[in-house]
Amino acid sequence: KANSNSFGDSKVRIFDVEAGLNYERLLGTKHDVSAVLTFNRNQQTTDTQQMANYHQGLFGRASYAFDSRYLAEFSFGYQGTEQLPKEKRYGFFPAVSLGWILSEEPFIKRTIGNKLLSFIKFYGSYGLTGTDDGIPYFYYLPTLAKTGSSRYHFGVNGTNVGGWGEGSVFNPHVTWEESLKLNVGTDIRLWKDRISLGFNYFKEKTSQILTTRYTVSTLSGYGFGGPLENIGKS
């Protein structure tokens, strides 16, 4: 009995560029401000896919803290991908967060003190994120596919020949899948950080999920599903 094994390998080439600016400053004695702005470009190429896959984006964050007690932050991502049609290629995804470090309040220090309550912070954030994961490569463009040798019939005798025909279904309106995320909670440390507690509530609502709209004929076993569309929710 003869056995045969086959082995193969593939190469992935990644080219990544990132550049950023950072700013920090203390205004007076109680106003702490900072900002970060970053540009990123990513390119991936594999042996089986000659055309590179590009992503690029601009990411920013601005933070403010007053007297180490009251915190506020705004962040955003302006992301681009060639997986989407030109008019929808870039998406803007902002987020905001607030925080309150209660243990830094003078009345807490006077009444409870740092020995019992080392640290307590309340926080909350709300933001929008987007992803192009799961979108087939160049799905927004029509394609041609090579047919078999008996696809077309010509002449009186019906000679069978191959050729090219319409490829897989496509969707010129495909866009980002988006998620709204809410997160609120508190962090507590007691007795000089000997005990740590944390409470967190998280909620996510996703829309424009890429899925297929099945027709009655498809469900009954005839026909085929339509193109992937951004119609799903969770």
What are these regions (language model features)?
Residues 1-234:
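Extracellular/periplasmic, surface-exposed regions of secreted and cell-surface proteins
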